[in-house]
A protein has these predicted regions:
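NAD(P)-binding Rossmann-fold cofactor-contacting core
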Residues: 1-13
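Beta-loop-alpha module in the N-terminal Rossmann-like domain of NAD(P)-dependent dehydrogenases
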Residues: 5, 16-74
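C-terminal helix-rich "cap/oligomerization" subdomain common to oxidoreductases
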Residues: 13, 26, 33-36, 177, ...
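Rossmann-fold dehydrogenase core element
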Residues: 71-90, 107-112
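Predominantly a Rossmann-like dinucleotide-binding segment in NAD(P)-dependent oxidoreductases
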Residues: 90-160, 262
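A short glycine-threonine-serine/GTX helix/turn-capping micro-motif
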Residues: 134-141, 211-215, 219, 239
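Contiguous beta-strand/loop segments that form the cofactor/metal-binding neighborhood of enzyme cores
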Residues: 144-212, 225-232, 255, 270-271
Length: 271
């Protein structure tokens, strides 16, 4: 194990078994695969170094904060010929993954809607002291989860429109290559009465909603690790590899850049 705090890495190693490293490159040289639990900008830098050592990568979402950084990770993975996976939780929950596989069999979905309202920054939350989540907000923290299902269901995203609400709430309209339009509404600061998730796809004659997770996050992570370890003939590939992770970052960055525009360039006043 390695961490920016050697003391905390040592504590974890003593608790779970293993060795704490002071130098991260020494650890990369000794292991076959690496799982990351660091801020996205730190992850992107370390992932490039790990790939250069020949380590397979299990990354958290988002892969990075910029498309350029995500591109560097993808290039490093390709050059080294290592495997890569990004942990989009729902993609490794059996029931939700099965739902996605079923909706992908149809091409008549014309719209989608995801609402993810949480409050993970309150005292007592394991994420309350996460600086990057406080700074970047719901778009970058839970936006990847929404995109991990909307993009494979409705197709690549060509352009976005976004607007801020109360707190860190943000709503993003996604225009897909297929012609479908989807919306994701996200918050990490939702009041108790509005917390929860909604996942919907609408077709010509019906609609469908994603079922609740039937596995725990630990079981989902176990499935992710198993996928990373699965041998494949020829070039190794997975729908949640670093290249998909990079595509998610591109969408998030586009939405973030849209939100940086002055208000008069984001909306048409109603007169």
């Amino acid at each position: 194990m390695w961490g920016r705090s050697l003391a905390r890495a040592t504590e974890m190693a003593e608790t779970f078994g293993g060795r704490a490293y002071e130098d991260v490159d020494d650890m990369f040289a000794d292991v076959d695969a690496v799982a990351f639990a660091v801020p996205p900008d730190v992850q992107a830098e370390l992932a490039v170094r790990a790939a250069a050592h020949g380590c397979h990568l299990l990354m958290d979402k988002p892969v990075a904060f910029t498309t350029e950084a995500a591109d560097r990770v993808a290039a490093a993975v390709d050059q080294a010929g290592v495997r890569s996976l990004v942990f989009f939780t729902s993609r490794y929950c059996a029931g939700q993954a099965q739902w996605l596989a079923e909706v992908q069999q149809r091409a008549d979905w014309n719209s989608g809607y995801v609402r993810k309202y949480a409050s993970i920054l309150e005292p007592g939350s394991p994420y309350a002291d996460s600086p990057w989540r406080r700074e970047r907000g719901a778009l970058w923290d839970i936006g990847p989860h929404a995109l991990s299902m909307l993009v494979p269901a409705l197709g690549p995203v060509t352009h976005v429109i976004a607007e801020r609400g109360l707190g860190d709430t943000v709503t993003v309209v996604l225009h897909h290559e297929s012609g479908a339009v989807s919306t994701m509404s996200l918050s990490l600061t939702a009041p108790p009465g509005s917390r929860g998730d909604t996942w919907l796809l609408f077709g010509q004659d019906d609609h469908t909603s994603m079922p609740d997770a039937n596995t725990t996050s630990v079981e989902a992570m176990t499935a992710c690790i198993s996928a990373l370890l699965t041998e494949q003939p020829g070039r190794w590939h997975h729908p949640c590899d670093v290249h998909f992770g990079r595509d998610v970052v591109k969408i998030l960055q586009a939405a973030d850049e849209f939100l940086q525009r002055p208000p008069e360039r984001r909306a048409q006043p109603v007169r």
